[in-house]
Amino acid sequence: MGSSAREPLQAITAQYDRVARFYALMEPLFLIFPPARRKAVAALDLSPGAVVLEVGAGTGRNLPYLVDAVGPAGAVIAVDASKGMLAEAQKLVGRRKWSNVQLLREDAAKLRVDRELDGVLFSLSYSVLPEPAAALEHAWEKMRPGARVVVMDVGLTDTRFRQVLAPIARLLTKLGPGDPYSRPWDDLRRYGSVGTERFLFGLYYVCVVVKSESGA
């Protein structure tokens, strides 16, 4: 996929529907490891009782960390447009008997959440969504002052290892949808100062922005 092209939502969901049952087995091919997910959830700085939204929750790979962070008094709202991916997430919720996880099949760009949010997570989804800025805007409107948006994703932009990592990124985009040249920090800067940390030789990053007490 090119640096500016995004696949339409229907095409993206079709791809994920096809691989949903095998997604966990495919994660090593994408160099996705539990420490990356834990790092993203930790960056949300959630407290027990918090309400958190995950945009592009997929099969629910982040749910154990999110549920642990908010505790039994908190709530996790997990959104994805793929029926197949959410079906796998529902199996996980059933096995773990989580009563505080709500799964929603929605287009994130049109999402309307009816609760105030203490955190919003885009984990490996911001570079895939056809309209990520719209999804961010809708989520931001429901965030409490002091709440955080965290974007964890893969990308080649602004990394000194860009030339070395380019073949890996091209392979990843062949295996699944996504724009390795996505710049989520440009969208996030509309809302405040952005903190960015890179890891795994700069291939992955975590971006954080905090909603000010004024609510701006």
Question: Whereabouts are the PLM-identified features?
Answer:
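Conserved class I S-adenosyl-L-methionine
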Residues: G2-D45, R61-Y65, E88, V164-L171, ...
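C-terminal alpha-helical "lid/dimerization" subdomain adjacent to the S-adenosyl-L-methionine
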Residues: Q10, L29-F30, V150-Y205
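Short glycine-centered segments of the SAM/dcSAM-binding site in methyltransferase folds
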Residues: V51, A75, G146-R148
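Class I SAM-dependent methyltransferase SAM/SAH-binding core
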Residues: L53-V55, T59-K110
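Helix-to-beta-strand junctions that scaffold the AdoMet/dcAdoMet cofactor pocket
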Residues: G71, L129-P130, M143-R144
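A short acidic, Gly/Pro-enriched loop at the edge of an enzyme's catalytic core
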Residues: A109-V120
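A short SAM/SAH-binding and catalytic strip from SAM-dependent methyltransferases
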Residues: G119-P132
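A short glycine-rich, Lys/Arg-flanked "PGG" loop and its adjoining helix->strand segment in the class I
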Residues: A133-P145
